[in-house]
Amino acid sequence: MGGIGKAIAVWLALAAPVQAQEPVQAQEVVIAALGDSLTAGYGLPRGQGLVPQLQDWLDGRGHDVRLINAGVSGDTTAGGLARVDWTLGDDVDGMIVALGGNDLLRGIDPGVSRANLDGILSAADAAGVEVLVIGMRAFNNFGEEYQAAYDAMYPELAEAHGALFHEDFLGAISGMDTSGQEGFLPRYIQADGLHPNAAGVARIVEDIGPAVEALIQRAGQP
């Protein structure tokens, strides 16, 4: 090709429109919240339970995430294990596991609860789903040995399965009363003395929110 031809070819190459690279859009992250009445929103108006308040909190912080409410009132760790496979649907990227409160209320052997939670986490491992374990703290109703075994199962299982861990679901609404007894703060609890009211849920969301953000980050990684 002569000098003129080369010049024309270079000019045409420079003049050709450059196609802009399409920005890579992060896909929506889907998180299932496997839990009991605390997750389901027992006793609260629609939109005031844990999952909708947490969804609003995450939306407000710019996360592209969709939460699935897989909370069933009265459920134990055994119930969670029985339904974990269908909770881990094809579109689920991450799972919050917040179970064990009803096991505690019923005095179920912590060894049984531990085995059930281990089964739930193993199912998530097999499905390639990232997990956040949210623990509960046992009061000393059943003795120190029971309390120690119950409290230890959450962090130990989370570590064994490489899951994220948040220590206490109800920690944000617990404290000392005027008599020096540890328990739930009355202004954040419904009349039944067990379940958080809407203001209590808001405090819980603020408390567990950063751990859920960490789960979203993990679950959203390719």
Task: Outline where the language-model segments fall.
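Serine-esterase "nucleophile elbow" of acetyl-processing enzymes
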Residues: 21-73, 83-91
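Alpha-helical cap/lid subdomain in secreted, periplasmic
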Residues: 63, 79-222
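Flexible, glycine-rich phosphate/dinucleotide-binding loops
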Residues: 40, 76, 140
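Acidic-and-aromatic substrate-binding clefts and catalytic sites of carbohydrate-active enzymes
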Residues: 45, 74-78, 111
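N-terminal signal peptide c-region/cleavage motif recognized by signal peptidases
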Residues: 15-17
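Bacterial N-terminal signal peptides that target proteins for export
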Residues: 1-8
